[in-house]
Regions:
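Signature for phosphate-centric chemistry
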Residues: 29-109, 113-302, 308-422
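Bacterial N-terminal signal peptides
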Residues: 11-21
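Sec/Tat signal peptide C-region and signal peptidase I cleavage site
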Residues: 23-29
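An exposure/low-complexity boundary signal
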Residues: 19, 23, 419-422
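Bacterial N-terminal signal peptides that target proteins for export
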Residues: 2-13
Length: 422
């Protein structure tokens, strides 16, 4: 028989070990990550040629040229996305989704918008997650993918009259909207205009306008949003301070203060429900179908790399918004992503969905900070009644989550698309 003092010691050891059995690591083992569908924005780029022309004209001065061609992923942007891809690869391996080393068949499929900045971002993500493995990046042969360039396909085009009416209805009194943002507009004017010289964009009223192609925008606001986006990208790129608003911006908090203009522009463009439903249903439908068991391609990680406009329309249909530290409501930073995860409870066999948006902070992007425990990716989760907080995040009952997230999909604007490209 065991001596009494040994029995007492054993009880003490068991009592000390008991908290370990209920620690998050043990709880996490209850849940198995089965599938990830991720929609990422491209990384840091200079202004597109069209944006540069517009902001030059609106401020009557030439904005700084970057070392990269306008609209293309920069070297700094590539490095920042590699950092994010490395963190995701590490996390997915720790959770058992991926195996060590290069991916085996059935682990990952990558589809990118055909533009250079999205293809290069996709390459950076897999170079980070699977260094040296040469993971294939798939994209259409032309310049229009039905998932991403939806304005170029009949089934997903908006009706100009309906779109104009929808934007006008949501915009309401634009003079009041402009007045509410007057302090932010003044900050932007102080940063980008030459004192005492014409700066046309800041003198005109905001008005709804529609191009011959049917694209609807808010004149005045849209070009201000382009300026703010260019400044945000420049900060994230680690441009010299002399090239950021001609030395007028020296802190990330100054960028943060300008971002409400981007939110306002999203609200009156891609976040307009009619626009999002016509042009975003096809992508949201593909994502929700892709997270299901037995979907094609039958891989553990389906990675889609596109544009902030795509993410904006999808999140509008999901009725999911966020506000990450240092960013305005609904902001979509370079390299950020919307992520769907399918989990299984190994005890009950029940399945769950987890949905979140993630990005790096303005300063972490600028200094190429590798995400770690001290500098984690910023994340905000989606939830609805019935979701539960677990050691692996907010998990929502599978079928109920699929139903809620897909309830605004317009079936007429969501024709089936082969995810696997020839």
């Amino acid at each position: 028989m065991m001596p009494v003092r040994h029995q007492v010691l054993l009880r003490l050891l068991f009592a000390c070990a008991l908290p370990l059995l209920t620690a998050p690591g043990h709880a996490a083992a209850q849940f198995e990550l089965e599938k990830v569908v991720e929609l990422s924005r491209h990384g840091i780029r200079p202004p597109t040629p069209g944006n540069r022309e517009a902001i030059d004209a609106a401020t009557q001065r030439s904005w700084p040229q970057w070392t990269t061609h306008d609209g293309e992923l920069t070297g700094h942007g590539y490095a920042a996305v590699v950092n994010k891809g490395r963190e995701e690869g590490l996390r997915f391996r720790q959770l058992g989704l991926l195996t060590a080393g290069c991916p085996a068949n059935g682990e990952i499929y990558v589809r990118a918008s055909p533009l250079q900045r999205t293809r290069a971002t996709a390459q950076a993500l897999v170079d980070g997650a699977f260094p040296g493995c040469g993971v294939a990046i798939h994209h259409v042969s032309g310049d229009a993918d039905p998932l991403f360039q939806t304005e170029k396909f009949a089934a997903t085009q908006t009706d100009p009259a309906h779109q104009l009416a929808a934007v006008k209805e949501k915009a309401g009194d634009l003079a009041l909207r402009r007045q509410a943002l007057a302090p932010v507009i003044q900050l932007l004017k102080n940063a980008v205009c030459v004192p005492g010289k014409p700066c046309p964009a800041f003198d005109q009223p905001w008005q709804v306008e529609q191009s011959k192609s049917g694209k609807t925008s808010i004149s005045g606001l849209s070009v201000m949003a382009n300026m703010v986006e260019t400044l945000r990208l420049g900060w994230s790129e680690n441009l010299p301070l002399s090239q950021l608003a001609w030395g007028n911006i020296t802190r990330s908090s100054q960028i943060t203060a300008l971002l409400p203009l981007l939110t306002e522009n999203y609200d009156l463009s891609n976040d307009v429900f009619y626009t999002a439903q016509k042009r975003g249903s096809i992508l949201l439908n593909a994502m929700l179908e892709g997270v299901k068991e037995g979907a094609t391609p039958d891989v553990r990680w389906l990675l889609l790399v596109a544009h902030d406009t795509n993410i904006a329309m999808v999140r509008t249909l999901m009725d999911f918004s966020w506000q990450l530290p240092g960013y305005s409501r609904g902001n979509i930073p370079p390299g950020s992503s919307l992520v769907l995860e399918r989990w299984r409870d190994t005890h009950s066999g029940k399945r769950y969905l987890r949905l979140y948006f993630q990005a790096q902070s303005l300063d972490d992007l600028r200094r190429l900070q590798i995400p770690d425990s001290q500098h984690p990716l910023l994340r905000q989760e989606w939830r609805q009644p019935g979701c539960q907080t677990t050691a692996v995040g907010t998990l929502c009952p599978y079928q109920a989550a699929l139903t809620t997230l897909g309830r605004h999909i317009d079936p007429h604007s969501a024709p089936e698309v082969d995810m696997v490209l020839p």
